[in-house]
């Protein structure tokens, strides 16, 4: 659901090539800072269960005469859920239950330069990341709850540069020596979050209003090039309206349900800068079989699909829609 990082290297180089200039030390430092933000953003986007995966495309002209397009594929497996039924919190009129969360993801990003001396070159990013954690959901009444959680995430990001242009082939070794391309970096991320939910029941239809604020603190601990180190903070704020509608039709002994959600996620810090995306909207629809009465099994299984859009980015995803009850 987010836009992939475009080739910052080619954008900066092309603006200097047109004037016959070299990259200064300060500009090289600025380029590396932007690359670090891209690593931070792609790692989070590649695995965080709060951000949707899918197929994404973006294009534009970041600098005059520097047209580019970018394609990104994000595959994720994971999610989160509440464990058991709410228990009383001492003598207080508050219920509580554990929350578990986890996700793993893979991201592949290809950035194509479409104009100038570097036309035909491509900068590619690959990300593998995994996260796990949990917290406690506190029920203030039967409808309103709040869940503080903490997760940890490990990620590995690698970059390769396909020098197809004459200029690229002649200079790619210099790019590599400067640590601009062809590197690997390992990162860890701490992810505290606060989720607020309100449930509405209309006959048998369930409406869930939620607001999820997340903070990310990311640092690298290993890199193939000493010039590539990552330290950054990011944030996201997701607001969602989810509707679950029972259809009263049995299939294989289970009731058929439909529904979906509409959400808007604001991005902040390195996540916004690295993806060059301010927000992402998502509309999702699903058709599932209900397993609601069976604990420690899927709550529902079916199919679902989403369309996502935001600043200069579009995306889509279709797949198996599963929710578990523990």
Specify the residue positions occupied by each region the protein language model found.
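Outer-membrane pore/translocation modules
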Residues: 25-33, 89-236, 242, 262, ...
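Outer membrane beta-barrel transmembrane domains
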Residues: 221, 226-326
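Short glycine/proline- and aromatic-enriched beta-strand/turn motifs that initiate or cap beta-hairpins
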Residues: 20-118, 326
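Charged interaction patches that mediate protein-protein contacts
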Residues: 1, 205-209, 322-326
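Residue-level signature of outer-membrane beta-barrel architecture
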Residues: 81-89, 134-138, 194-202, 245-249, ...
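Sec-dependent signal peptide recognition
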Residues: 2-11
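N-terminal signal peptide c-region/cleavage motif recognized by signal peptidases
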Residues: 14-17
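Short N-terminal helix-initiation segments at or just after the protein's N-terminus
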Residues: 40-43, 204-208, 246-251
